[in-house]
Amino acid sequence: MTLEEARRRVNELRDLIRYHNYLYYVLDAPEISDAEYDRLLRELKELEERFPELKSPDSPTEQVGARPLEATFRPVRHPTRMYSLDNAFSLDEVRAFEERIERALGRKGPFLYTVERKVDGLSVNLYYEEGILVFGATRGDGETGEEVTQNLLTIPTIPRRLTGVPDRLEVRGEVYMPIEAFLRLNQELEEAGERIFKNPRNAAAGSLRQKDPRVTARRGLRATFYALGLGLEETGLKSQHDLLLWLRERGFPVEHGFTRALGAEGVEEVYQAWLKERRKLPFEADGVVVKLDDLALWRELGYTARTPRFALAYKFPAEEKETRLLSVAFQVGRTGRITPVGVLEPVFIEGSEVSRVTLHNESFIEELDVRIGDWVLVHKAGGVIPEVLRVLKERRTGEEKPIIWPENCPECGHALIKEGKVHRCPNPLCPAKRFEAIRHYASRKAMDIQGLGEKLIEKLLEKGLVRDVADLYRLKKEDLVNLERMGEKSAENLLRQIEESKGRGLERLLYALGLPGVGEVLARNLALRFGHMDRLLEAGLEDLLEVEGVGELTARAILNTLKDPEFRDLVRRLKEAGVEMEAKEREGEALKGLTFVITGELSRPREEVKALLRRLGAKVTDSVSRKTSFLVVGENPGSKLEKARALGVPTLSEEELYRLIEERTGKDPRALTA
């Protein structure tokens, strides 16, 4: 073996061992046996002994033991200061910013700016030495932050190793939680009666500060990077636009929409366009960041004690409104959980009137100290769900009244039970629980029983014709024709719809049954993982945690439901009625046995491509490993591409993927839907 061949193999082995260390020590999800791991480590040691010039202090052979599993959050000093940004809230303030630049530089504008979306997350700093990640830390006070390296490494797009960079380098960015992950996490926490997060930014901060990195890994955090600290001069970069491209080329995720704009008026055009698109984004964006594009001008302008003189945050208008909490209603969900709902003086927020707002659970009410009659500040969490941000206690008059939880179910009168901070109606005959369960089961995204509306469900329950969803399949024509406004034709149509619903498949059935924390996406993932209801009923906690999108709280809640005798009896009766318990066969199983990972931007939405691959029998994962069959590479790929090359994983362009699908199915993949 030549020195060059040894160098390539040593680098490959180090990457492999680091990757498996990460799986074992951080995610607690090893992919190889201890014996296979030992074989890799032994081969690396032998090569380093045979070629001592290849030894390196960062080699896994030089590290004593493993990284600690618990994050420590020790204070760490940033090599160079992290500054804040001045804010602007109007075009006039952006013009004033440009005028300050003109005066400082002694020349007239307009100047060229790079404009980037301002992702609302938590600022972090990554520090590399000789291309190796030494630590990652939060911004803190700008001088000193908290080390969160272990938790940052659970974000798969953060590179551990770089090539073609200065010896000492700081990379700055934002860690954030996508809106979908935020809503899912809050649903889990609410179901458990735990404290929920007010917004995705708080959720990201709380998730990054988990002591157990495995918890962080399940929270779905993402990162985007946009700046360099130490090492910027050594790169020789001339513009912010080029800096973003430079970061992307080295495997860092960079928010894809950045652009250039000329002068304050050009910035305003971009701002207005992005403001309209704000709610279409998968993450919270609270404005745009405006930076002089020419880095030489940065050096001329410098910094104040707190902020750079060459950059500005142009904030989107706050969609927060003040209103009064008039009363609180208590609703009974299909699982019996009691949810307090605040009745508000109507207020207009983000295009719609808001008159009701969830107060989640007892923990939320206690933490907020909200009372009937209070003035409250309301917004839409994730741009979707109306929520109380805070109580305006300075406006209290003394006439406000505390919120008193009922002792009995507001629907059936049965005594409520308390599980932690969750109030629940245990009555299996509670009409509200039955109504909500049947309504959800029949809904379009569940079993899609057209014609079974709310009024008809109420009549069926009132007449004692159904008690639960399994009874729907025992209905006969003579049961229905005597109901008000239900003729013979309508009865026949409804019975046909009920019969057709038997064949919807496991995915729709799981969503329809309302397992805790299980929405459409999770129902699909469970169906793909287990394939049949019988296998799901036998699943354990670890089996559920292997399913994409399932965190520990959701896994335990699902498991409790699966083991519940009433639920198992319901499933038995549905099976006897002929309801399909198996996942629907995926078209031709054309890609069965193949595992795909996707990186970069595709011409179709990524989730759509993932769903298509799964429908064709493939497995889709988020991280590259030796088990990956193909890495699909779109525009502006991330660090997964480098890892795939290190592991020898084949890559496909989007077009090559579609050609593969066409070869396997004989159909144009663009005509196939997920």
UniProtKB/Swiss-Prot annotation:
GO cellular component terms, semicolon-separated: cytosol
Pfam family, one: DNA_ligase_OB
Key words, A-Z: DNA damage, DNA repair, DNA replication, Ligase, Magnesium, Manganese, Metal-binding, NAD, Zinc
Residues making up the signal peptide according to the UniProt record: none
Start and end residues of each BRCT domain: 586-674
Top-level EC class: ligase
GO molecular function: DNA binding; DNA ligase (NAD+) activity; metal ion binding
Binding site for Zn(2+): C409, C412, C425, C430
EC number: 6.5.1.2
Catalysed reaction, written as an equation: NAD(+) + (deoxyribonucleotide)n-3'-hydroxyl + 5'-phospho-(deoxyribonucleotide)m = (deoxyribonucleotide)n+m + AMP + beta-nicotinamide D-nucleotide
Listed cofactors: Mg(2+); Mn(2+)
Active site (UniProt): K118
One BP term from GO: DNA replication
Binding-site positions, NAD(+): D34, A35, E36, Y37, D38, S84, L85, E116, R139, E174, K291, K315
Function: DNA ligase that catalyzes the formation of phosphodiester linkages between 5'-phosphoryl and 3'-hydroxyl groups in double-stranded DNA using NAD as a coenzyme and as the energy source for the reaction. It is essential for DNA replication and repair of damaged DNA.
PANTHER family: CHROMOSOME TRANSMISSION FIDELITY FACTOR 18, DNA LIGASE
Protein family: Belongs to the NAD-dependent DNA ligase family. LigA subfamily.
The protein's name in its UniProt record: DNA ligase
UniProt source species: Thermus sp. (strain AK16D)
Gene name of the record: ligA
